Amino acid sequence: MFFICNVGPFRSWKESKIFWKMEDGSPNDIQLILVTATDSSLPSGNSNQDKFCKFGFVCLSTSFERGVESDNGRDWNFCLIIISSWAVLPVPGGPVMYSESDLCSEIAFAKKFITCSYSAVLAGNAPSLLFKLTSSDDFCKSAFVLKKIDCEPNCSFSGDDSGVTSVNCNFFLFKGRGGVAGASSNRFLLIRLVGVIGIADMNVYGTIDENSAAQCSEYSKIVLPENIPLLYK
């Protein structure tokens, strides 16, 4: 079991499990537990972030298009469960330049170690056609920003009116802004989307804003017991 910290409180939450399938095919059930955290517990520099960021969690506001508006045009809110790995180590004296081809090679390496399968049961009408990230200025501005990279296909969802929706795996890239001390960061955090949980009536912070430099008072982090093995390094 490990603990996933959320960027903010939920008004409603239904307990869910995500099933990890290791390379040898053996399933590992991992129970998700959501808690809140503030930036007072964020490391002030990069010294602890290797352990700090091995796993992560971020919430987005998403909207689905079905050809016609349903549920008064309301957006569905989802939480993306991710597994992360540092793609670039810091280099003293300047930022690290890491090409897209290098990142894609890193992704290809990571894909050898884990596959995923997850289905989310949604309340009400099931979104079915198109998944897109919306733009919002009120996104919780954490120490990292999320950026899509081109060496993996877009997230795709499938579902029907029964309320069951599946999601394919994908990769994203976090570029570090530094810790709460404000130090510049020259690391990239590579994360893999491994599942989606549908949550109704969630307090929404908005979606990814790559251009914002603001810090946030609440953010996402993971607390791992020492005996949990890393899936890849």
Swiss-Prot record:
The chain crosses the membrane at residues 78-98, 113-133, 188-208. It comes from the Eukaryota. The keyword Magnesium does not apply. This is Putative uncharacterized protein YJL195C. Partially overlaps CDC6. Keywords: Membrane, Transmembrane, Transmembrane helix. The lineage of its organism: Eukaryota, Fungi, Dikarya, Ascomycota, Saccharomycotina. It is found in: Membrane. It is a multi-pass membrane protein. GO terms for cellular component: membrane.
